[in-house]
């Protein structure tokens, strides 16, 4: 079977009150259009056609790597007109699945069932299969009209509906599947004699009835699958729906969330056994948490891997890091891209790292900046230590070998190497390589000024 998918993404999204096209607004860390394209890809179609119009160049430039065929709708004359723009690119014998870019939570299984419905009754001549839903509040959506035999014979849009039709709770989702040859016959016959003055795709139902093409429907099991986004309130509602489902899936697999309503996933999160996640944590990109990991409140992890038994304390930010087993991080720590910790390391409060590689058992417990640095095993970095890695033009590396003890308030001016088991005295500024097994310090002699008096505040005139 040749499957062609059309995604409608040309709408202006006026009710978003935004300069950003609606389909580029984010849900769970990804643009709405990306959600729909990724779902479509799972159906293994022969092609995905995205119909763009308003803000089209911005959409294309923001999502340059989407595996789609872009089709321009120069004038936004309605959903039927939008689908018509793609038809010259689609073979007559292909099956066409029409999706909306602002309906992001449609599920693959539902779409597979709808495609099967479009073939089930008459494999040689496709039926028109519609995805419908029963909603308690169907306001704003097209209503399904059935005859006395329960057969669909029309869809009436909200703006064209009378009060009797508005009381119907069965709605059309905007998702349908049929043979391309059917669409090529029906779409040129659409009329714009309606309240909007547009060519509605829903009018193909009456044309199918006239042509005696069978119409079948599939009712979505979950109402969120057919919920569209037209304003920021609806975007927020679907965001919470997505997050609640993600939280439930994690808990079903054994993770503990302190509060599933205060959890945000903006990518992929993989948890081992007995993982604990406190409130207000954000996970972005791909995050892997090993067995027994604990994440404290208000933490942000982006593209991070944590080994077994790690604990990240409150208000810590980790990005692009690989952390081995039994490490402790925070509170208020910031680990930037390129940070790697071997097992049993500690990064304490108000420590920032960047391109820092720690070997086993190394600790930096307080108030330090460690950038472009290699640290050996069992190094102790005192409070206030800074690797001075930038000369105003280039970055330089600091190497600290095994067993080094660095006293508090030390500046290491890179490039510099500190030899194994060396000790650096507190308050030192190290500009040259430090020999192993020795004490090195830069001494400024302490002086006492006897008889010195503090200044006295002058009386004002």
From Swiss-Prot:
Region N-acetyltransferase: start-end pairs: 254-461
Listed pathway(s): Nucleotide-sugar biosynthesis; UDP-N-acetyl-alpha-D-glucosamine biosynthesis; N-acetyl-alpha-D-glucosamine 1-phosphate from alpha-D-glucosamine 6-phosphate (route II): step 2/2; Nucleotide-sugar biosynthesis; UDP-N-acetyl-alpha-D-glucosamine biosynthesis; UDP-N-acetyl-alpha-D-glucosamine from N-acetyl-alpha-D-glucosamine 1-phosphate: step 1/1; Bacterial outer membrane biogenesis; LPS lipid A biosynthesis
GO molecular function terms noted in the UniProt entry: glucosamine-1-phosphate N-acetyltransferase activity; magnesium ion binding; UDP-N-acetylglucosamine diphosphorylase activity
Pfam families, sorted: Hexapep (PF00132), NTP_transf_3 (PF12804)
Region (Linker): 233-253
The keyword Transcription regulation is assigned to this record: no
Catalytic activity: alpha-D-glucosamine 1-phosphate + acetyl-CoA = N-acetyl-alpha-D-glucosamine 1-phosphate + CoA + H(+); N-acetyl-alpha-D-glucosamine 1-phosphate + UTP + H(+) = UDP-N-acetyl-alpha-D-glucosamine + diphosphate
Region feature Pyrophosphorylase, mapped onto this chain: 1-232
Record EC number: 2.7.7.23, 2.3.1.157
Matches recorded under Gene3D superfamilies: Hexapeptide repeat proteins, Spore Coat Polysaccharide Biosynthesis Protein SpsA, Chain A
Compartment(s): Cytoplasm
Required co-factors: Mg(2+)
Residue positions binding UDP-N-acetyl-alpha-D-glucosamine: 8-11, 22, 73, 78-79, 142, 157, 230, 336, 354, 369, 380
Group of enzyme by EC: transferase
PANTHER family: BIFUNCTIONAL PROTEIN GLMU, NUCLEOTIDYL TRANSFERASE
Family in the record: In the N-terminal section; belongs to the N-acetylglucosamine-1-phosphate uridyltransferase family.
Record's subunit section: Homotrimer.
Protein name as catalogued: Bifunctional protein GlmU
Organism, as annotated: Legionella pneumophila (strain Paris)
Native organism taxonomy: Bacteria, Pseudomonadati, Pseudomonadota, Gammaproteobacteria, Legionellales
Gene, per the UniProt record: glmU
